[in-house]
A protein has these predicted regions:
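N-terminal low-complexity, Ser/Thr- and acidic-residue-enriched intrinsically disordered segments
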Residues: 1-3
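Active-site region of the double-stranded beta-helix
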Residues: 12, 20, 24-167, 177-211
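Residue-level recognition of conserved beta-strand edge/terminus positions
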Residues: 172-176
């Protein structure tokens, strides 16, 4: 597997409007799914009717999304398009994948990961806005086996890829390849991390519809 970039790979995978709809379903916005990339902690009051007290209130979440880079995990079934694409990835590579939604509404804030590498391959699709995406040559002798790789690392040399991603564009970043995403405008993207080992553990990709 090598780094790759394709224009207009999947137009209309996911939109601001679809994301807005999900954000307003408070039970989905748990602290296990929502990651605000800063070092602060937050407290809030809950309605007596709330079943899960660890869900971000929409007013707080809106404020944080306007100021910080955030990402959301376990999102591979949130729309039919994302679910279908995750199924395609799993069938192609014979491995399980998730979908992580990344959002940056404030292009002036530095990406907290900086230049970093991951321990699994990622297919990243730009959904809204523009991103300058760079990928450098593979790092050898990586000893990490678990976790999320390393962030804010130093690399030398010219990047293998240095592209402006527009809605529908795709970049494939294999494991151990340093990369950096710089938001040019407010942007929304979906990353599909692919597990390293082949296995039969799959999300149920059935999509039901009510008839009539």
């Amino acid at each position: 597997m090598n780094p790759d970039f394709k224009k207009d790979y999947y137009p209309n995978l996911f939109t601001w409007k679809e994301f807005e709809y999900l954000l307003n379903i408070r039970p989905l916005m748990t602290d296990k799914r929502v990651f605000i990339l800063n070092e602060d902690s937050y407290m809030w009051s809950n309605s007596a009717l709330s079943l899960n007290k660890n869900c971000y209130p929409p007013s707080l979440l809106e404020d944080l999304l306007e100021r910080y880079t955030c990402y959301f995990v376990d999102m591979s079934r949130v729309t039919k398009n994302i679910n279908d694409f995750a199924r395609t990835v799993e069938n192609k590579y014979k491995k399980q994948c998730d979908a992580h939604v990344y959002v940056c509404r404030n292009p002036d804030v530095d990406h907290p990961f900086g230049i970093h590498y991951d321990l699994v391959p990622n297919i990243i699709i730009q959904c809204e806005g523009q991103t300058n995406f760079k990928v450098w040559d593979k790092l050898e002798n990586i000893t990490d086996k678990m976790g999320h790789g390393k962030i804010n690392i130093g690399v030398t040399g010219e990047p293998l890829l240095d592209v402006i991603m527009n809605p529908g564009d795709m970049v494939l970043v294999p494991e151990h390849y340093p990369h950096h995403a710089i938001s040019i405008t407010p942007r929304l993207s979906v990353s599909f991390p692919i597990q390293i080992y082949e296995n039969d553990d799959r999300e149920d990709r059935h999509w039901f519809r009510f008839e009539g």
